């Protein structure tokens, strides 16, 4: 039986070579690694945002639950890389009863899929982008505030 040879690099798809010819000891980033990257992102925020953001729980799962996908009317689980689950600070009151913590969900497989599709960003950059986007929902940030710390803001 003949062995398959690796695909030659294609300059139009530089990420393809990384995907088809990974280093022998490389593995897809784990749930724990993505959570670590999310916490590192929060630690680099300006202090006015960093301190309150440390109270938000970070949860990382491979995929969103079916209920999340249905509630957001998405085509499928790969359409959601992250989700803020909580009450935005702009809607909270000091008299509110805290029933559950605010959570930022990160979804590993959709993040990895987008990372492979983009091919021009690091996994750290992509996770930071998703975390900042979800934090924007929590803080009620303006477009200018988001753009000040997230260069990908569209």
PLM features: residue spans?
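Catalytic glutamate of the conserved HExxH
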Residues: 130, 134-138
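N-terminal amphipathic/basic-hydrophobic helices that include classical n-h-c signal peptides
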Residues: 1-18
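Short, highly charged C-terminal tails/helix-capping segments
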Residues: 144-154
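Active-site rim/adjacent substrate-binding subdomains
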Residues: 13-126, 138, 142-145
